[in-house]
Amino acid sequence: MEQTKKWGFWLLTAFVVGNMVGSGIFSLPSSLASIASPFGATSAWLLTGAGVLMIALVFGHLSIRKPELTAGPQSYARALFSDPKKGNAAGFTMVWGYWVASWISNVAIITSLAGYLTSFFPILVDKREMFSIGGQEVTLGQLLTFAVCTILLWGTHAILVASINGASKLNFVTTLSKVLGFVFFIVAGLFVFQTSLFGHFYFPVQGENGTSIGIGGQVHNAAISTLWAFVGIESAVILSGRARSQRDVKRATITGLLIALSIYIIVTLITMGVLPHDKLVGSEKPFVDVLYAIVGNAGSVIMALLAILCLFGTMLGWILLGSEVPYQAAKAGDFPAFFAKTNKKGSPVIALIITNVMSQVFIFSVISRTISDAFTFLTTAATLAYLIPYLVSAIYSLKVVIKGETYDQLKGSRVRDGLIAILACAYSVFVIVTGTADLTTFILGIGLFFVGLIVYPFVSNKFQKEKQA
């Protein structure tokens, strides 16, 4: 049976890299250039990479020391509490927040992919009015974009239902292709790279109020932009139930991080060495502008193809991840048992259907202002759902170290893991505080988890069993 096949190191690594390296990378060089010098941007990448490495190491050693916890952060949240009732509630809210966030992120990726398709199909931005809904005019472009997004969502659904293992191999191919695409971009950029465009490797930048921002401020501001490039680092851990070896999970998480970090740093420096600073800061499509300097008008076509390839792989990985969360939750008893139903190919069909139906609702945001407003609202709220699991995992790792679980005696590995857990906790707090600096974002995010507590008694199998006991 196909479902007995386990995923090895390279397939898991492809999910980590593919889910991290998405659409954000194409705008990051210009946004970083506006707030940091080359030295400031590089320092921010290294600082963020070091922080995420601590989280990756936490995920890695937990996957080995606690191999029975195969659902990632939701398992760690449950195991964090000695009281089963509290643990079950914590595990459920973690699942709920991450799952709801996946509906939103899936739609964001799909609409971004449709946006890049306009380079080849300009009719997708056609402004001709077709009809009105509730007094709102719907244009031909909006209608076609809705159709394209729907096809992309359910086409990906069909791929995953047909063969979950086949989808993992397809994801590997798309991830390898996107990495090779960035290697091509880097090599091509080196031919027109000019160190003179750097000016000085470090220089103060001007803030919005005209004040001069030094290296500390540059690194802090740039770190806010760079931290989002690493969301997805948890991919291999969430998929660890399908892994051939828990050591592969650890190796894939760390290797995926190092590959993504290398791409981020090098392409950032390449763009800074090809485009003049003023032009880079004002560029909406810095990658296109770099390739235009190398190959002329064909640059925009090449870049659009790379972006589409990037986003297709990211879409495939995140839709799978979004369905894997409720699937693993059902196997653990947190969600109703029907979420764990699989077909002969091992695909979690019910989890996929329900996840994608919820995503479909928000695809209406491209033609409905009401749903668009709700989509924006939930996007803000979902921010915290991707950040909290990092902190919970780090705290649980620290608990394991302090209690000495799986450590026979006080060895160097226990001290090392404890230090890593402390650093991961500190970085996770920084990420949450920085990533939700807007009080509204924080309140909405907490509200999302609060909703999880409200629905917990009605959805959780474990709660029903506790009630009957």
Curated annotation (Swiss-Prot):
Annotated Pfam families: AA_permease_2
Catalytic reactions on record: L-ornithine(in) + L-arginine(out) = L-ornithine(out) + L-arginine(in)
Entry membrane topology: Multi-pass membrane protein
Keywords, in A-Z order: Amino-acid transport, Antiport, Cell membrane, Membrane, Transmembrane, Transmembrane helix, Transport
Gene3D superfamilies per record: Amino acid/polyamine transporter I
Family, per entry: Belongs to the amino acid-polyamine-organocation (APC) superfamily. Basic amino acid/polyamine antiporter (APA) (TC 2.A.3.2) family.
Listed name of the protein: Putative arginine/ornithine antiporter
